């Protein structure tokens, strides 16, 4: 049948970095006969997935959002972190019209300025330097009640590393003589992205009503009490910070709320609980009518609140270019990485392109993925293999979340099991691609599972790495690999393998040359 398509499949193994040392390396120590043979026998190279190569500051570890934006754009996309660092350094942040108007409004009406966000130097969802700049902006413009609601990390940072950040902000508020840390809570609750509304409700009640399971006189004492209960930063239970005699810092009508996370995927849910009139994820005991709610960057097109830094639009991303050339494409992943192969890969475009189908596989409902390291990979592989053999698609883009999601738990044995599960999946994908006479690229968006312990601290290493990632070609063409690539070279590589023109906006270079 002449209309049967021979697909080009891009398989992204999330968190699957390349590291030569075996110590604490869940990828190298796992039994991976399939990937081993592919690496030995197929054209392959290593590509950069962090720092300046993906538009992040030099040395900054890569992450899934940044990785997928670069994969889909075919050019280095300067990330919000880099953009905001530059704005603060050059002083423009302090005159941002959206932020200054929101603070001025609170000052004029005698209301509080609430600042919330992930208090972390991780630089993945936020950066504490940006939060510090926001505190300074509010104080400079005359805000007299400044409340910081700190979401704690321990995922993109070491599991117990929040104390220095809390001390830094406590000292800043003391220096200003104004404002305080009003609450602390782990990101597990405040930044869920998987519709676990019971978690989000705990964060919402803490923020709106100053209602939490625990109370402490100061943030460091609250954190130390959480550690004594066995909670790492990520899992710190809702804790109200309020010294004897202090008024509570609940959010009230007319207050200003500024959300300082710059990454969208884990900011959306809690934002919707504040701003959606029809929100029904849980019963909100208190609905606050804010004077201003500001999101630092755009979390979703349908969230209709002011945005301090709207997105710069990307034209002729890989998905859009396929649409313009009447090609069909499929995006497929589990819940945890679905936004990455759709919204982020498409350069921040929410709606599918014409000819773009999407398949969402539900991630398992477990507390943490070390409890089910295989996640939903069996169902994902079954659907992927079926799509490869369907003859419907020119291109299929798939993300397997296991390496990253299990890597984040810090559980080495579970990460090994996750990697071994992936090897079995890849075997099935390779067979399906060969049967369809298609082409397959296997890569990753960033590293994680190859470094499961921090050699400096001895703690579990739950964060991403700055290491390179593999790129392997399997298919019906004789190709030669080019060295020195990066994630933004993948889209031009794919267009080249499809013998399509590469748009001028894509500055990446093909990494496999047809011989």
Curated annotation (Swiss-Prot):
Binding residue positions for substrate: 125, 155-156, 187, 193, 263-266, 337
Write out the residues that bind Mn(2+) 2: 14, 64, 445-446
Residues holding Mn(2+) 1:
404, 408, 464
TM ranges are none
Q: Name one GO cellular component term.
A: cytosol
GO process terms (BP): carbohydrate metabolic process; glucose catabolic process; glycolytic process
Q: Name one Pfam family in it.
A: Metalloenzyme
Q: Which GO terms describe its molecular function?
A: manganese ion binding; phosphoglycerate mutase activity
Which reaction(s) are listed as its catalytic activity?
(2R)-2-phosphoglycerate = (2R)-3-phosphoglycerate
Q: Which residues form a coiled coil?
A: none
Enzyme Commission number(s) of this protein:
5.4.2.12
List S-S links within the chain. Answer: none
InterPro entries assigned to the protein according to its UniProt record, in alphabetical order = Alkaline_phosphatase_core_sf, BPG-indep_PGM_N, Metalloenzyme, PGAM_B_sf, Pgm_bpd_ind
**What class does this enzyme belong to in the EC scheme?**
isomerase
List UniProt keywords, sorted A-Z. Glycolysis, Isomerase, Manganese, Metal-binding
Q: Can you tell me which residues form the catalytic site?
A: 64
Summarize the subunit comment: Monomer.
Q: Which HAMAP family match?
A: GpmI
- Give the family, as the similarity comment puts it: Belongs to the BPG-independent phosphoglycerate mutase family.
Provide the function of this protein. Catalyzes the interconversion of 2-phosphoglycerate and 3-phosphoglycerate.
Please report the name of this protein according to its UniProt entry. 2,3-bisphosphoglycerate-independent phosphoglycerate mutase
What is the originating organism of this protein? Yersinia pestis
């Amino acid at each position: 049948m002449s209309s049967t398509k021979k697909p080009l499949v891009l398989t992204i193994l999330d968190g699957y970095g390349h590291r030569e040392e075996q110590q604490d390396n869940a990828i190298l120590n796992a039994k991976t006969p399939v990937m081993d043979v592919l690496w030995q026998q197929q054209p392959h190279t290593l590509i950069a997935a962090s720092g300046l190569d993906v538009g992040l500051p030099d040395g900054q570890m890569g992450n899934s959002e940044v990785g997928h934006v670069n994969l889909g754009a075919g050019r280095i996309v300067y990330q919000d972190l880099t953009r905001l660092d530059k704005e603060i350094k050059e002083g423009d942040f302090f005159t941002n019209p959206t932020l200054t108007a929101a603070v001025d409004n609170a000052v004029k009406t005698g209301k509080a300025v609430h600042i919330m966000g992930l208090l972390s130097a991780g630089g993945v969802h936020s950066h504490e330097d940006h939060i510090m700049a926001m505190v300074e902006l509010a104080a400079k413009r005359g805000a007299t009640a400044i409340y910081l609601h700190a979401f704690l990390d321990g995922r993109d940072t070491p599991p117990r590393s929040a104390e220095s950040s809390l001390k830094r902000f406590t000292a800043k508020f003391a220096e200003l003589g104004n404002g305080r840390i009003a609450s602390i809570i782990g990101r597990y609750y405040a930044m869920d992205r998987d519709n676990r509304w019971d978690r989000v409700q705990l964060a919402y009640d803490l923020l709106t009503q100053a209602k939490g399971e625990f109370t402490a006189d100061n943030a460091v004492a609250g954190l130390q009490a959480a550690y004594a209960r066995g909670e790492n930063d990520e899992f710190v239970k809702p804790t109200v910070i309020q010294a004897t005699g202090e008024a509570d810092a609940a959010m009230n009508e007319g207050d200003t709320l500024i959300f300082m996370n710059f990454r969208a995927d884990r900011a959306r849910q809690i934002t919707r609980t504040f701003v959606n009139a029809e929100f029904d994820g849980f019963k909100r005991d208190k609905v606050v009518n804010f004077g201003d709610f500001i999101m630092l960057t755009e979390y979703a097109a349908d969230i209709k609140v002011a945005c301090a830094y709207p997105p710069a639009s990307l034209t002729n991303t890989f998905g859009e270019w396929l649409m313009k050339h009447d090609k069909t494409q499929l995006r497929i992943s589990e819940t945890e990485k679905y936004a990455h192969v759709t919204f982020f890969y498409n350069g921040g475009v929410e709606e599918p392109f014409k000819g773009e189908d999407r398949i969402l596989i539900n991630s398992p409902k477990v507390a943490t993925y070390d409890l089910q390291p295989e996640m939903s990979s069996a169902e994902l592989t079954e659907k992927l293999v079926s799509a490869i053999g369907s003859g419907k698609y020119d291109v299929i883009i798939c993300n397997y979340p296991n390496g990253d999601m299990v890597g984040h738990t810090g559980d080495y044995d579970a990460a090994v099991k996750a990697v071994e599960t992936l090897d079995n999946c890849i075997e099935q994908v390779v067979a399906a691609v060969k049967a369809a006479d298609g082409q397959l690229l296997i890569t990753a968006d960033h590293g994680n599972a190859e470094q499961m312990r921090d050699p400096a601290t001895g703690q579990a290493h739950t964060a991403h790495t700055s290491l390179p990632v593999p790129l392997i070609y399997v298919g019906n063409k004789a190709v030669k690999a080019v060295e020195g690539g990066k994630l933004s070279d993948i889209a031009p590589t794919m267009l080249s393998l499809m013998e399509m023109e590469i748009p001028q906006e894509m500055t990446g270079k093909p990494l496999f040359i047809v011989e």
